């Protein structure tokens, strides 16, 4: 059933720029090398070349021995399997590079019906598609308005946060695009970054200024909003309201599996060394559309920051880590109480992550120029 979010600001984009449905997507599947080939920048593109460097090799990361040395538990355990409370540490789990050749991979989201991952390649102004069953990679949309974070709503529609569009959009099942939010109090948003959808259909999103700071990941512009807020879009009226206004740079956002907690990352450290590099948790009242009881869930080891966040069905919190010590690049896993369980080491700066796979236990990781994957022993909460 379509919510009234489809009513305000509806805009149909050129159908030539939209590849509709899983069947149409399949016809565009190309090799990783072909997907990274240079193309002329279409209208709205930043003009950045569509190749970054020589693609990295695919497959398991170097090491070739179980247990995979890229999986590190915070606690000591049996040498082969490790402690059971870190669900990415088991005898035959291995980190794999499944696609490469991008410029800055971000915002992965898994579509179970088609068994594919969509993710943004922000500077190249495109959304990519990784087909899980055969490993093919294709361009899902170009231009993408320098989309960053992506999620999926309860009706299976793609929700995207666009830098150069400075808006949140929804791709309808017929391929048309609806603008969900582009202004607050009559002024343009900064550059929406990441979003989640609660069970009532409300869309919650973050709005830092990263996409308007220059021409690499968007279009340089002056911010019109005084603060960098977290917003909620009402599922019935389409009204937009501020739910949190005290972040330096709100970034990744996620829900606990029971929707009683909202997690929001603050990457304010990128604006100055005295600013936070942390993730905060809030008590969430979905029906009231409000949050309360803000707490620091975890601090990152500066100068590293966390960018993306997901949860599993047991309430563990999975965070991307990068931009600081290369030894910290990767993913961190925490208990619901904020205790560090373990790390997944990735040889590139990591921006974001999502769970996917037929059993919802495969963790996909966007690491700079590549998409990585590792099987775990838990299931993602699959809350978008």
Listing of model-derived features with the role each one plays in the protein:
Residues 282-289, 376-381:
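Short loop/turn segments immediately following beta-strands, especially the blade-tip
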Residues 126-128, 167-169, 229-231, 278-280, ...:
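A short loop-to-beta-strand structural motif that recurs across blades of beta-propeller domains
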Residues 123, 164, 213-226, 271-277, ...:
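Short, solvent-exposed loop/turn segments at conserved positions within beta-propeller repeat blades
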Residues 96-99, 136-140, 178-184, 240-243, ...:
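A short beta-strand motif characteristic of beta-propeller blades
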Residues 51-93:
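Blade/loop signatures of beta-propeller domains
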Residues 100-116, 143-162, 167, 185-205, ...:
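Beta-rich, blade/repeat-based domains predominating
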Residues 1-17, 24, 39-40:
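N-terminal secretory signal peptides
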Residues 172-202, 208-218:
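Asp-box/WD-like beta-propeller blade repeats and closely related beta-sheet repeat scaffolds
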């Amino acid at each position: 059933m379509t919510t009234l979010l489809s009513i305000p600001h509806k805009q149909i984009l050129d159908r030539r720029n939209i590849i509709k449905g899983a069947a149409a997507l399949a016809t565009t599947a190309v090799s990783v090398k072909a997907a990274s080939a240079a193309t002329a920048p279409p209208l709205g593109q930043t003009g950045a070349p569509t190749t970054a460097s020589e693609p990295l090799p695919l497959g398991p990361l170097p090491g070739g021995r179980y247990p995979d040395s890229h999986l590190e538990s915070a606690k000591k355990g049996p040498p082969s399997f490790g402690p059971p409370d870190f669900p990415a540490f088991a005898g035959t789990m291995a980190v794999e590079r499944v696609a490469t050749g991008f410029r800055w991979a971000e915002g992965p989201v898994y579509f179970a019906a088609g068994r594919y991952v969509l993710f943004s390649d922000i500077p190249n102004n495109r959304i990519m598609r990784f087909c899980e069953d055969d490993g093919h990679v294709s361009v899902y949309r170009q231009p993408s308005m320098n989309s960053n974070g992506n999620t999926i709503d309860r009706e299976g529609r793609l929700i995207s946060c666009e830098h150069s569009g400075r808006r949140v959009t929804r791709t309808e099942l017929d391929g048309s695009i609806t603008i969900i939010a582009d202004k607050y109090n009559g002024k343009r948003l900064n550059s929406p970054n990441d979003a989640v959808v609660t069970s009532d259909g409300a869309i919650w999103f973050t709005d830092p200024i990263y996409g308007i700071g220059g021409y690499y990941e968007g279009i340089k512009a002056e911010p019109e909003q005084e603060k960098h807020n977290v917003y909620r879009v009402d599922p019935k009226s389409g009204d937009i309201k501020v739910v949190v206004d005290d972040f330096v740079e709100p970034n990744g956002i996620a829900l606990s599996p029971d929707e009683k907690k909202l997690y929001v990352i603050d990457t304010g450290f990128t604006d100055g060394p005295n600013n936070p590099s942390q993730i905060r948790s809030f008590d969430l009242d979905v029906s009231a559309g409000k949050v309360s009881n803000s707490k620091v869930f975890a601090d990152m080891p500066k100068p590293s920051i966390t960018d993306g966040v997901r949860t599993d069905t047991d309430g563990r919190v999975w965070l991307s880590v990068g931009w600081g010590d290369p030894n910290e690049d990767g993913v961190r896993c925490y208990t619901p109480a904020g205790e560090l369980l373990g790390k997944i080491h990735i040889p590139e700066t990591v921006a974001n992550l999502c769970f996917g796979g037929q059993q919802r236990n495969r963790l996909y990781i966007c690491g700079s120029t590549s998409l990585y994957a590792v099987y775990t022993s838990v299931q993602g909460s699959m809350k978008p």
